[in-house]
Amino acid sequence: MAAAAAAAAAAGAAGGRGSGPGRRRHLVPGAGGEAGEGDPGGAGDYGNGLESEELEPGELLPEPEPEEEPPRPRAPPGAPGPGPGSGAPGSQEEEEEPGLVEADPGDGAIEDPELEAIKARVREMEEEAEKLKELQNEVEKQMNMSPPPGNAGPVIMSLEEKMEADARSIYVGNVDYGATAEELEAHFHGCGSVNRVTILCDKFSGHPKGFAYIEFSDKESVRTSLALDESLFRGRQIKVIPKRTNRPGISTTDRGFPRSRYRARTTNYNSSRSRFYSGFNSRPRGRIYRGRARATSWYSPY
C-alpha cells in the first residue's frame, strides 16, 4: 500500500508539471486495486484508472468576450442630432418631441396657400385703388382743361370784353323755327366775317324760340347787316337790330319775351370761315355757357 501511494504521488506530481500550474491530477485505483496511469486506449485499461482534476475558481467561469458595437453611420456636417430610433439614451423622449415639431410644418403648409391668397387679394385691391385714383386724376384734368378757343372766350370774358363783343353782334328776330345756324350765316355772309351764330332754344322742349344772335369780326359788319332788316329769310320777314349788353343787376322786359327758361344752340366760325357745331349753350344774363344752363325771363337780347 505504501508503494502504491508513493507511485500515485509521483504520478500526480508529474501530471501537475505537465498540465500547468494550479492543475492537480489524482489516480483512482482500478478494478485490480492498483493505481496507475495507463493508456486510455489500451486493452483492459477501460475503467481501471480514472483521472480527476481540480480547477481553480478562475478557470471554472469562462472569460467574457468583448461585444463589438455595430458601426454607426456618420451624420453629415451641420445635420441635426440623432433622430428617432437612434437608440441613444432619451431617444424615446426625443422621438416624441420631433414628432410634434414635424406636425407644425404640416399645419404651416396648409395655412400658406390661404395667406398667399389673402396677399394676392390685397395686391389686387391696391392695384384697383391705383387705377381708380388715376382715373379720378384724369377726369379732374379734363374738367380743369380749358375749353376750345371758340367756346372759352365767352366764359372768361370780362364785362368790358363782353361789351366789345356785343358791339360786334346783332339780334335777329322772327327767325323760322326750322332755321339752322349755317343758314343764318349764309344769309348774312355778304355783310362780313361771322364769328358765332347762337340760336336760343326752349330748355324743356328743345325747340328754337324764334330769335338768334350773330357775332361779326368787326363793328363795320354790324352796320352793314342792318340793311337786311325786314328782309325775307325762309319766307319770313326777319328783324335785325344791334345787340345790347345786359349789365349786372339790370333786368328788362320791354321786348316782350315770355317768362320762361331757355337754352342756346351756338355755332362758331373761325377766321378761315370753317364751321363747327358746338352743341347747346345757354346765355343767362347775356353770357354764353357750355352745356345746358338756365336763364330767367328778364333776359334782354340787346
Curated annotation (Swiss-Prot):
Subcellular location: Cytoplasm; Nucleus; Nucleus speckle
PTM characteristics: Arginine dimethylation is asymmetric and involves PRMT1 and PRMT3. It does not influence the RNA binding properties.
An example Gene Ontology biological process: cellular response to lipopolysaccharide
Biased composition (Pro residues): 73-83
Comment field on protein domains: The RRM domain is essential for specific adenine bases recognition in the poly(A) tail but not sufficient for poly(A) binding.
Domain spans labelled RRM: 168-245
Reported function: Involved in the 3'-end formation of mRNA precursors (pre-mRNA) by the addition of a poly(A) tail of 200-250 nt to the upstream cleavage product. Stimulates poly(A) polymerase (PAPOLA) conferring processivity on the poly(A) tail elongation reaction and also controls the poly(A) tail length. Increases the affinity of poly(A) polymerase for RNA. Is also present at various stages of mRNA metabolism including nucleocytoplasmic trafficking and nonsense-mediated decay (NMD) of mRNA.
Annotated stretches, region: Interaction with PAPOLA: 282-302
Region (Strong poly(A) affinity and self-association): 255-302
Highest classification ranks of the organism: Eukaryota, Metazoa, Chordata, Craniata, Vertebrata
Modified residues (Omega-N-methylarginine): 17, 234, 255, 259
Quaternary context: Monomer and homooligomer. Identified in a IGF2BP1-dependent mRNP granule complex containing untranslated mRNAs. Binds RNA as a monomer and oligomerizes when bound to poly(A). Interacts with PAPOLA, but only in presence of oligo(A) RNA. Interacts with NUDT21/CPSF5 and transportin. Associates in a ternary complex with CPSF4 and NS/NS1 and interaction with NS/NS1, blocks nuclear export of host cell mRNAs. Associates in a single complex with SKIP and MYOD1 and interacts with SKIP in differentiated myocytes. May interact with SETX.
UniProt keyword terms in alphabetical order: Acetylation, Coiled coil, Cytoplasm, Methylation, mRNA processing, Nucleus, Phosphoprotein, RNA-binding
Coiled-coil annotated spans: 111-147
Residue ranges, annotated region (Disordered): 1-111
Compositionally biased residues, Acidic residues: 51-68
Ranges of biased composition (kind: Gly residues): 30-47
GO cellular component terms, semicolon-separated: cytosol; nuclear inclusion body; nuclear speck; nucleus; ribonucleoprotein complex
InterPro entries linked: Nucleotide-bd_a/b_plait_sf (IPR012677), RBD_domain_sf (IPR035979), RRM_dom (IPR000504)
Gene that encodes it: Pabpn1
PROSITE patterns with a match to the protein in the record: RRM
Tissue expression pattern: Ubiquitous.
Protein name: Polyadenylate-binding protein 2
Residue numbers spanned by region Stimulates PAPOLA: 115-143
Positions bearing Asymmetric dimethylarginine: 234, 255, 259, 261, 263, 265, 273, 275, 283, 285, 287, 290, 292, 294
Species this chain originates from: Mus musculus
Chain positions found as Phosphoserine: 19, 52, 91, 146, 231
Interaction with SKIP: annotated span: 2-141
